[in-house]
Amino acid sequence: MERELRLGIMGGTFDPIHYGHLVTAEAVRSEFKLDKVIFVPAGNPPHKVKRKVTDKKHRYLMTILATITNPFFEVSTIEIDREGYTYTIDTIKEFKKIYGEKTQLYFITGADAVLEILTWKSADELLKMCNFVAATRPGVEGNRIDEELNKIRKLYGNVIYKVTVPSLAISSTDIRERVAGGRPIKYLLPESVERYIQKYDLYKKDEENGV
């Protein structure tokens, strides 16, 4: 009998994408023997309304450049093609339509995001539709994460997996601030992405790039 397809879904603003994202995706892919990981750059994320997000075309192309050398990575335009705010529940429903209801989806998120997952739109439905993988990050208290995971298990009977990934203290915010301040970003992200940022002068001006 043919094995069910196992897909990792990694959503994010990717403004810009960096090695922390890539290391996390590969660690989860290996841990759960996923057929592939699909990166989903956010279109108009409701939680980023306080900061102007870089144009979706730039974020999409940077994600392509960062993932193109890994045959198990793909990039989807499913959210950047959608009008209005983009919510995870809508994205998961779309992937279920595309790949079939039997496909096992593993939504990859930072462990810190688990602390807010019950506030997400249609959280109860979302928790039933896909598996969640919480990747531990530097600076996040393990006890708080475990408490939240236990609470979700009791409420929904849903197991959220926790995966420890190599500790890379890299953030998109720091990269944007470094570029704006004229500081180096080498070795924080793929060289192809660094060249793209330089070519299009991204993150240089607050009013244009939302730094």
Swiss-Prot record:
It comes from the Bacteria. Transmembrane segments: none annotated. Its EC number is 2.7.7.18. Pathway: Cofactor biosynthesis; NAD(+) biosynthesis; deamido-NAD(+) from nicotinate D-ribonucleotide: step 1/1. GO terms for molecular function: ATP binding; nicotinate-nucleotide adenylyltransferase activity. One of its GO terms (biological process) is NAD biosynthetic process. The keyword Nucleotidyltransferase applies. Pfam families: CTP_transf_like (PF01467). It catalyses: nicotinate beta-D-ribonucleotide + ATP + H(+) = deamido-NAD(+) + diphosphate. Keywords: ATP-binding, NAD, Nucleotide-binding, Nucleotidyltransferase, Pyridine nucleotide biosynthesis, Transferase. NCBIfam families: cyt_tran_rel, nicotinate (nicotinamide) nucleotide adenylyltransferase, PRK00071.1-3. PANTHER family: NICOTINATE-NUCLEOTIDE ADENYLYLTRANSFERASE-RELATED, PHOSPHOPANTETHEINE ADENYLYLTRANSFERASE. Belongs to the NadD family. Catalyzes the reversible adenylation of nicotinate mononucleotide (NaMN) to nicotinic acid adenine dinucleotide (NaAD). This is Probable nicotinate-nucleotide adenylyltransferase. The lineage of its organism: Bacteria, Bacillati, Bacillota, Clostridia, Thermoanaerobacterales.
